[in-house]
Design a protein with these regions (language model features):
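Glycine-rich adenosine-cofactor-binding loop
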Residues: 1-11
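Rossmann-like adenosine-cofactor binding region
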Residues: 24-112
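Residues at the starts of beta-strands that form the adenosine-phosphate
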Residues: 7, 15-16, 96
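P-loop/Walker A phosphate-binding loop and immediately adjacent motor/lid segment at beta-alpha junctions
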Residues: 9, 18, 62-72, 146-147
Length: 151
């Protein structure tokens, strides 16, 4: 999964790496990645990355208070795992930064979050490339061919 890959990359830079998951990951812990309960994780880390399924809520107003200010939040999820008004309030505090790959999860390119100076949003899905687009189209055509050959 993406979170595990990110954690291992950060270890290569000799960073202290922590994670939270509903299920413990002994294989990650054996590599030196430390598990923390979510509340404790928020109070411990300076940078938090989220790697969740679409429409999975994670943080509310109280969680952002625990996370605090002077932090970086990175979201790789297609949707925001927190209410946008709560995210906006947190971003209005000094020293907070938000990095996200697509504008859909922050209300679009015409939304006020997209235009905030402490938000980095290239509005391109991180895994998107010309090659991935070609491969996707090939897969769609293969699926159509397979379906038509059996029906």
């Amino acid at each position: 999964d993406v979170g595990s890959v990110v954690a291992e990359l950060l270890l290569a830079f000799k960073m202290d790496v922590y994670y939270y998951s509903r299920t413990r990951k002994p294989e990650m812990e054996s590599k030196g990645i430390k598990y923390l309960p979510f509340d404790e994780l928020l109070q411990t880390v300076d940078v938090l990355t989220t790697h969740l399924h679409k429409n999975t809520p994670l943080m509310d107003c109280e969680d952002f208070k625990r996370f605090g200010n002077g932090k970086v939040l990175i979201n790789t999820t297609f949707t925001a795992p927190y209410p946008l008004d709560v995210l906006r309030e947190w971003l209005e505090e000094p020293g907070n930064y938000y990095i996200v790959d697509n504008s859909v999860s922050i209300g679009g390119t015409d939304g006020d979050i997209f235009n905030m100076p402490n938000v980095i949003c290239p509005d391109m899905v991180a895994g998107q490339s010309m090659q991935s687009g070609v491969l996707l189209r090939i897969k769609v055509l293969e699926n159509i061919r397979d379906y038509l050959s059996t029906h």
